[in-house]
Amino acid sequence: MADTTGRIPLWLIGTVTGIPVIGSIGIFFYGSYSGLGSSL
């Protein structure tokens, strides 16, 4: 775990790519339930 110099940690990649994906899915389902997603 100490040899992370020069490389991006896997948990950092998962966090940076996971939050926008979960957020967009949450916004999509929230919009569809509130009636905004039906126009997409």
Curated annotation (Swiss-Prot):
Domain of life: Eukaryota
Subcellular location: Plastid, Chloroplast thylakoid membrane
Membrane topology: Single-pass membrane protein
Database matches in Pfam families: PsbJ
Xref: InterPro entries: PSII_PsbJ, PSII_PsbJ_sf
UniProt main location, coarse: plastid
Keyword NADP: no
Transmembrane spans: 8-28
SUPFAM superfamilies documented for this protein: Photosystem II reaction center protein J, PsbJ
Gene Ontology cellular component annotations, sorted alphabetically: chloroplast thylakoid membrane; photosystem II reaction center
Keyword terms: Chloroplast, Membrane, Photosynthesis, Photosystem II, Plastid, Reaction center, Thylakoid, Transmembrane, Transmembrane helix
GO BP term (any one): photosynthesis
Cited function: One of the components of the core complex of photosystem II (PSII). PSII is a light-driven water:plastoquinone oxidoreductase that uses light energy to abstract electrons from H(2)O, generating O(2) and a proton gradient subsequently used for ATP formation. It consists of a core antenna complex that captures photons, and an electron transfer chain that converts photonic excitation into a charge separation.
Subunit and partners: PSII is composed of 1 copy each of membrane proteins PsbA, PsbB, PsbC, PsbD, PsbE, PsbF, PsbH, PsbI, PsbJ, PsbK, PsbL, PsbM, PsbT, PsbX, PsbY, PsbZ, Psb30/Ycf12, at least 3 peripheral proteins of the oxygen-evolving complex and a large number of cofactors. It forms dimeric complexes.
Similarity comment: family membership: Belongs to the PsbJ family.
Official protein name in the record: Photosystem II reaction center protein J
Biological source species: Chloranthus spicatus (Chulantree)
Lineage, uppermost ranks: Eukaryota, Viridiplantae, Streptophyta, Embryophyta, Tracheophyta
